[in-house]
């Protein structure tokens, strides 16, 4: 739940190092899990927030940076995180490690307010639920 609040603050009042540090502090150690959302079963983070994939990402490469990454928060992996099964990591342009599912980087949507929300599905016809 803290991630959307931090993202909203960063979008409204600035960006830069403070926001980067705040978002990095919310890194996830374990792989995402599946859960029911408002639009069906999807992968979720540790807080139960719906995860999404971006059509414009390449295999093993995020193309959502700068302002895009304020609205679509990369699911950052903790330095101790271990990949397993279909879950892996990509290295973002800023050097941080991001969780990926079947090679596709994973994100949360800043406008989802509570676990189970799935308001990002279909945004600009390029954002979709990350389905297990």
Describe each model-derived feature in a short phrase:
Residues 1-5:
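Positively charged n-region of N-terminal signal peptides that target proteins for export
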Residues 6-9, 76:
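Short helix-onset patch at the extreme N-terminus, typifying the N->h transition
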Residues 23-132:
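Compact beta-sheet-dominated domain cores in extracellular/mature segments
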